[in-house]
Amino acid sequence: MAITKRLFKSFYRLLLPVIILLALAIVGVSIGFIYKTARPPKAKYLVTPEKYGRFSARGARVTDETWANRDGTSSRGWLLRGAEKSPAVILFHRYGADRSYVLNLGVKLNEATNFTILMPDLRAHGENPLVKNSSFGGCETDDAAAAIEFLKSLKSENQKNLVGQDIGVYGVELGALVALSAAARNENVKAVALDSIPANSNNLLNSTINKNFPFASSLTTKLAEFGTRAYFYDGCYKNDSVCEAAKQITNRNVFLLAGSDAPDFQTSTEKLSRCFPPNTHLETKTDLNPSGYSITNASLEQSEAYDQRVIAFFKQTLESSER
């Protein structure tokens, strides 16, 4: 019996360092996946207001703005001012994109409605981002609240409030997560357009991991999910269900868009349509090809048709709220 115990202890002492090293390796690899994914590749803006303004008088009026977030960091965005006390619309881009992806839509929306338009860079996105890490919708939701506060602080030339009471939000994929959460928190968000929305932050993270690390995707996604606990020790990462957020959006206008170019998010968007309360005015268009997820690869005709759908939604829902 004593010999057996000694053998077990010897085996345990030999095995314990291996277990510890293996655990540390798993933690290190999982954090490495998150580190890479939370810092998407950077690229130059597709177009800037300076270049856009050469062809559009309205585009030449876009200004570059910064404002404080609630956690002490800063956000930035392009702002196109509208008429005094008119609604404002915030356009949120998808993961891996930046504010230049929504500039054309923003200018056309302003031309059609004279609403104030804000086009922010989400965390870790755009040239030389002000915040280095994306949190896949967690702290970005707090940033969206700060963006609304920034809009409410704007003054017109007459030193009156530039933006009226009502706000609209539009988002694609990551941007859709942010837009929905912002609407759930703020009843002044009256019009919500969501394109290719993931079911939650894990759904977005897994999709991104699968694209960046396609080998053994099921294993890498599990490791990445595990790594979020350590990497986002500040609580920025939240895996809240979009269905639960949708249940809080009462008596609002919602437009859901999706397409076969992002089939996973097409499915999650269709499922989301069943989560809103009965008094939500809901429109759906989930058979697009392409959706806003890959609209930059579309023809001019497809891009124009998509933009006009979004513009018509905000024009109808927010202009009626002004009356």
Label each region the model flagged.
Residues 86-94:
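Short beta-strand element of the alpha/beta-hydrolase
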Residues 159-173:
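Alpha/beta-hydrolase fold nucleophile elbow
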